[in-house]
Amino acid sequence: MTGFSLDPRLQADTVPVCDLQLSAVRLMRDSHYPWLVLVPGRPGLVEITDLDETNRARLMEEVALAARALKAVTGAHKLNVAALGNRVRQLHVHVIARFESDAAWPNPVWGGPRMKPYEAGEMDALVERLRAALGQHSERG
């Protein structure tokens, strides 16, 4: 990841889960929704199309892996996957567990209720469960 640095907003809004071959997997601090963010560890990326063909395919595999792990850990009714980048230009992909009972359902999470921090220990427990689900595929588990 030479020359790579995480955008300060992503750094502030997320905590590390693990590193996959291409991407850092991070958990949003918002307890309204179990929400992963995958950030490819290459400098200067804004769009998915900025990745070469090999890394673009790798990113899609890592998104699928993260989505399967998140669904297995949370029992989500639906997964939302998006790469927007309107506020944070650094390429990152959101993988969000959605529930019919969640604070924004059925609308998008953006523009919903204000961020709600996890209770003490709750975020750490979720990170550990996600690491276990992703562990056999990560470079750091």
Per-segment meaning from a language model:
Residues 1-141:
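HIT superfamily nucleotide-processing domains
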